[in-house]
Swiss-Prot record:
This is Ocellatin-P1. The lineage of its organism: Eukaryota, Metazoa, Chordata, Craniata, Vertebrata. Keywords: Amidation, Amphibian defense peptide, Antibiotic, Antimicrobial, Secreted. It comes from the Eukaryota. Antibacterial peptide that inhibits reference strains of both Gram-negative bacteria (E.coli, E.cloacae, K.pneumoniae, P.aeruginosa) and Gram-positive bacteria (S.aureus, S.epidermidis, E.faecalis, Streptococcus group B) with relatively low potencies (MIC=25-200 uM). The peptide shows very low hemolytic activity against human erythrocytes. Wheel projection demonstrates the amphipathicity of the alpha-helices is low which may explain the low antibacterial potency. Expressed by the skin glands. The modification Leucine amide is found at residue 25. GO terms for biological process: defense response to bacterium. The keyword Secreted applies. It comes from Leptodactylus pentadactylus (Smokey jungle frog).
Amino acid sequence: GLLDTLKGAAKNVVGSLASKVMEKL
C-alpha cells in the first residue's frame, strides 16, 4: 500500500544518507 511505499522510500533515503556519511568518515 501507500504506507509501505513511503516506508520503503524513507529506508532508501536513510540508506543513501548513511552511505554518504560513511564515505566522509
